[in-house]
Amino acid sequence: DNYLDPNAQLGTQIEMNQAPTGIGWNNIEARRWLVDYYKREQTTDGKNDSRLFYTLWYDGAASDFPEYPNQLIYGSPWNSDWGNRVFIKKYSTDASPLYYWNDNNFRSLRYADMLLLYAEALNELNATPPSKAIECLNRVRNRVNLPNIEDSKYYNGSQISTNKDAFREHLKIERALELAMECVRWVDLKRWGI
């Protein structure tokens, strides 16, 4: 019972809210477009973006990440009844949902968020993206082994790194991927007037 240890860490109900049907309440799900966006670009060693593995559960994840062939959702394999749905893995413990007692702390502020916000501010203050803005973006990308934006094989890196509007549009994508399910998307959309 999760309520027996008086010294347990006090967490949130995030796990129960996002756990798949039959395991939790399933109040929150991700959208398939997010999986597709993560899979657009491969890392420098030809693998899928690791943020996808740590953020979402979906049918096909085992083939997208063969280094983790026996992926479990709270101790259970993927259920074919879930079909093409996408569940949130971030903040989960891969164990039975822990209700309030969970030592996986909710991060309210992240360094990557600050880097991307700083890059966005620098871009808005200049006619073209300054080198410091590009450096901040690349630090976030390089952390997950993605190439510098200028060297991207999927995105038009030369345009993104030299055009203010293209850089802004790409930051919207990077923020969605890096900060998925971290309660910043609504604020981002409001700031961008979307």
Model-found features: residue ranges?
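Acidic/polar-rich alpha-helix caps and helix-coil junctions
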Residues: 1, 42-194
